[in-house]
């Protein structure tokens, strides 16, 4: 059992079975967008650490059990993309609302660029994720 530093929430836990190389974690979302409630930077660090572990199967907090790469690659790609976009918005002095509007405009033009993972609940959580990340990265 491992307690993680701030990531998805402020109290994430996981269980790892050495014998079967199975990892249970609420930090991992499969087939649906992650909802950021604590720290995207902390969560990404946690996922990077999980990526280095000798895991065969991940039982996510949200979604079906899958192989490690199937679980981690989409969420890490999304986090990297979101962090990069929001940092650019900060550099260009774009407000949180203007950031969301910019992404909304792109979504209308080409939804595959905005939600390439094809996640469920994307519209419900993506824009709150932008706002959360915007606030977190404001103090970098």
Language-model-derived ranges and their functions:
Residues 4-85:
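Metallo-beta-lactamase
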Residues 85-92:
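Positively charged, polyanion-binding regions of nucleic-acid-associated proteins
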Residues 92-140:
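C-terminal regulatory/interaction regions
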